[in-house]
Design a protein with these regions (language model features):
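Extended, subdomain-level signal for the structured scaffold at the beginning of enzyme domains
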Residues: 1-105, 117-122, 127, 138-163, ...
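A short beta-strand/loop micro-motif in the catalytic core of glycosyltransferases
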Residues: 109-110, 131
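Short, thiol/selenol-centered motifs that function as redox-active sites or metal-ligating centers
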Residues: 112-114
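Catalytic cores of processing enzymes, dominated by hydrolases/peptidases
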Residues: 133-136
């Protein structure tokens, strides 16, 4: 069975985070593990508070993630949006190193809304890639990189696509926001399973 890790930090966007979790689990071919990433506002190592004040109990805390997945890489890692949540994810240096490690190993690295610009860009994995994010956030990558890398270097030879609901370029998958979460989630299902599984899931859940 394929493995997917979903990283959650306080301030994550609930629809963007849990739509992929739900659809991937419905495929019955992907084991999805949610991971709570520490942040200054966290009171419990497992409980993460969404941007709309919905608490979610993660499957693993961050120490458990490090004990189980630093060497045994999953097939996919995913970062939801929400500006505060994305900023909390981006502040974690161990997570940035893990993104680079998974990317270099050919694992799928995926993000939606604020996360492509805030979390992924400064790791350098968007270089030479087609990608998308929440509208207008691509203009602020210099700010999000916070001096760790210049925006011109982070996005060297990349193409920002502002119209498509999601972009898949090699092992990098990005999407725009809450309204594109379902299409994005189904692309992740297709990539980790197959087109027929995605089709059956689309029919079974009465998608438009």
């Amino acid at each position: 069975m394929k493995q997917a890790l979903v990283f959650l930090a306080d301030g994550f966007e609930e629809i963007e985070a849990l739509t992929p979790v739900d659809y991937l689990r419905r495929s019955h071919q992907v084991e999805v593990t949610t991971v709570a990433v520490p942040s200054p506002t966290m009171n419990d190592p497992y409980i993460v508070l969404g941007s709309h004040k919905i608490p979610v109990i993660a499957d693993m805390n961050f120490d458990e993630f490090k004990a189980n997945f630093l060497e045994e890489l999953p097939d996919l890692i995913f970062f939801p949006g929400g500006m505060t949540g994305s900023a909390n994810l981006a502040a974690n240096k161990e997570l940035a190193a893990y993104i680079k490690k998974c990317f270099a190993a050919g694992k799928i690295v995926s993000a939606i809304c604020a996360a492509p610009a805030v979390v992924l860009a400064k790791t350098g994995i968007l270089k030479g890639r087609r990608w998308t994010c929440y509208p207008e956030m691509e203009k602020n990558v210099e700010q999000y990189c916070a001096g760790e890398i210049s925006a011109s270097e982070a996005l060297e030879n990349s193409v920002h696509c502002s119209e498509n609901p999601f972009e898949t370029d090699g092992n990098v998958v990005t999407s725009r926001g809450v309204g594109t979460a379902e299409q994005f989630a189904m692309e992740l299902v297709r990539l980790l399973t197959d087109s027929e599984t995605a089709r059956k899931l689309r029919v079974g859940t009465v998608q438009r």
